[in-house]
Amino acid sequence: MEQVVIVDAIRTPMGRSKGGAFRNVRAEDLSAHLMRSLLARNPALEATAIDDIYWGCVQQTLEQGFNIARNAALLAEIPHSVPAVTVNRLCGSSMQALHDAARMIMTGDAQTCLIGGVEHMGHVPMSHGVDFHPGLSRNVAKAAGMMGLTAEMLSRMHGISREMQDAFAARSHARAWAATQSGAFKNEIIPTGGHDADGVLKQFSYDEVIRPETTVEALSTLRPAFDPVSGTVTAGTSSALSDGAAAMLVMSESRARELGLQPRARIRSMAVVGCDPSIMGYGPVPASKLALKKAGLAASDIDLFEMNEAFAAQILPCIKDLGLMEQIDEKINLNGGAIALGHPLGCSGARISTTLLNLMERKDAQFGLATMCIGLGQGIATVFERVQS
């Protein structure tokens, strides 16, 4: 079976969904920009040699509809002979895109794939056109379709206080801002055209979603966003609404070596699981455990974790049940997470994996694990092993 390697991993800056940098930029353009950038950064790869493109996107309608993967590839002037498919596993879409490509390579059906994902939540809101089947209420609580209420449920089940949530959210912003200031994101962010507050065209090379002024004290004044009577989850402890894309160049190790391209990491294992929709945010726990089992590793073997921060109330129970509460500041989301950077649904799986790979290189780490919860009760995880140059 072929070894699957990540040769390159990049992303756009994360733009605010409400009047942000990409308010006049379409999702297809964000995607095409990264496809072109991957090829420009790796000139040894001919575009005609790409076997397939897998692109995650959740709200596949309006500008994100009609197979956005193919539309973006055509915009990027990738040869017409290269196919492309859009993948949807809700929040896990672009990580699923990675898994799909990896399996193609493992089985010998492909040698080279572009993967990634995009979501423009400013142009296509998360709830746009959603119409749940009435019969679902026979099997699933209606509140299970309301992500904030599932986070409230988890916080109550696991004893996660409002104070713990506020502290974690403040940490996310502080770490993301520190990473920005230190240049830690420089190798992953591709400068991307947008418009400033005055409508002037500008190249953005930083995440505009981060709020460096965030404090626990300020967060403590916010009202509950989903359960106004007894809730603890606020807008400040939830992932921000943002627009963005992320992408990776995935190859068989043999093809990468043949082209003289240095692999950055191998995919050691992959896992996806289902869980109770009412606690959808718990999915990373069984997904991570399954991925670790497949890799022949324990949580203690993992040097760095990237766990998508859908809500502080959601990620903290996952950290707790993976036995990592005492290691948060050494191992988990060292450059902040979705609370500070936002969670463009179809983009996030590739985004957290990209950030993880860069952190693994900076920290000289051997193993990293990226994982995320998925709406309606699923979890997805990937274990990466760094390839020494």
From Swiss-Prot:
Q: Is the Lyase keyword given for this protein? A: no
Checking NCBIfam families in the record gives: AcCoA-C-Actrans, fadA, PRK08947.1
Encoding gene, per UniProt annotation: fadA
This chain's function reads: Catalyzes the final step of fatty acid oxidation in which acetyl-CoA is released and the CoA ester of a fatty acid two carbons shorter is formed.
Its Enzyme Commission number?
2.3.1.16
**Which reaction is this enzyme known to catalyze?**
an acyl-CoA + acetyl-CoA = a 3-oxoacyl-CoA + CoA
Its domain of life reads: Bacteria
Task: Show the active-site residues.
Answer: C91, H343, C373
A GO cellular-component term linked to this record? cytoplasm
- Top EC class for this record: transferase
Protein name in UniProt: 3-ketoacyl-CoA thiolase
| Family recorded in the similarity comment | Belongs to the thiolase-like superfamily. Thiolase family.
Q: Name one GO molecular function term.
A: acetyl-CoA C-acyltransferase activity
- Describe the subunit structure: Heterotetramer of two alpha chains (FadB) and two beta chains (FadA).
Q: Which cysteines are joined by disulfide bonds?
A: none
| Pfam families membership | Thiolase_C (PF02803), Thiolase_N (PF00108)
**Annotated keywords:** Acyltransferase, Cytoplasm, Fatty acid metabolism, Lipid degradation, Lipid metabolism, Transferase
According to its UniProt record, in which pathway does this protein act?
Lipid metabolism; fatty acid beta-oxidation
Q: Name one GO biological process term.
A: phenylacetate catabolic process
Stretches assigned to coiled coil:
none
Where would you find this protein in the cell? Cytoplasm
